[in-house]
């Protein structure tokens, strides 16, 4: 098999695996279905990856790389821009990733949290922690030198939750239109602007000592 053909087959397997894992999760996905979708011999998974478990890990990493290519985590912000602008673009990029119907890694991660296999724990930590550290650094910068680490983590958790939960509900509503779920986000740009304003206002409020009642 030529190197080019081998690389194409591997790429097709990763793409097919991402589709199957995001639809069915790890346990219900089968090697046979993945190979059939990829147009590959059923022995191809063992040949290229050594088994379903390693394919799961590599497929998630491949899906993440694809979504980050489409939605760079920094949102294209100038590294020298003020922290407010850098945080704004970072949050808009995150929300764009989650809202994008082509994004698979995020929803594979959600399925892994709901039904853990333990197979993605190491690779997720290796890939996601550096991105989280950059967000924490921006929040830390915005809170100022007097902020303690607990305050930084609390603010970051609230901000990311505002980005994630409504867009998960939006995706669920799109997938199950007959469920008549309440519309939370009907305008992604307007929602992103709102989240950024709310986040920056919350950070500003956290910097201001609470008045004694």
What spans do the regions from the language model cover?
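Generic hydrophobic, amphipathic alpha-helix propensity
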Residues: 9-18, 34, 59-67, 135
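Hydrophobic alpha-helical bundle segments that form small-molecule/ligand-binding pockets
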Residues: 80, 129-153, 176-179, 203-211
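Helix-turn-helix
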Residues: 12, 20-54, 58
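Amphipathic alpha-helical packing segments from all-alpha helical-bundle domains
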Residues: 68, 85, 117-143, 190-193, ...
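Hydrophobic alpha-helical connector segments
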Residues: 72-104, 152-159
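Amphipathic alpha-helical segments used for helix-helix packing
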Residues: 100-122, 170-176
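Short alpha-helical scaffolding segments that buttress acidic/His motifs in well-ordered protein cores
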Residues: 91-94, 106-113, 159, 163, ...
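N-terminal intrinsically disordered/low-complexity leader segments
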Residues: 1-8, 175, 208-213
């Amino acid at each position: 098999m030529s190197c080019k053909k081998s690389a194409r087959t591997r790429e097709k397997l990763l793409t097919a695996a991402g589709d199957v894992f995001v639809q069915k999760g790890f346990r219900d996905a089968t090697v046979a279905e993945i190979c059939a979708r990829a147009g590959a011999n059923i022995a191809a998974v063992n040949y290229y990856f050594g088994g379903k478990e390693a394919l799961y890990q590599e497929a998630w990493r491949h899906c993440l790389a694809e979504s980050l290519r489409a939605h760079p985590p920094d949102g294209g912000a100038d590294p020298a821009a003020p922290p407010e602008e850098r945080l704004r673009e970072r949050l808009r990029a995150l929300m764009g990733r989650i809202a994008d119907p082509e994004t698979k890694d995020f929803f594979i991660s959600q399925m892994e949290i709901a039904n853990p296999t333990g197979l993605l724990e190491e690779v997720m930590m290796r890939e996601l922690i550096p991105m989280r550290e950059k967000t924490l650094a921006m929040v830390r910068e915005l809170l100022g030198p007097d902020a303690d680490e607990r305050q930084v983590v609390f603010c970051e958790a609230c901000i990311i939750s505002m980005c994630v939960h409504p867009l998960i509900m939006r995706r669920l509503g799109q997938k199950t239109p007959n469920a008549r779920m309440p519309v939370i986000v009907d305008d992604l740009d307007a929602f992103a602007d709102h989240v950024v304003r709310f986040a920056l206002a919350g950070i500003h409020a956290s910097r201001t000592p609470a008045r004694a009642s």
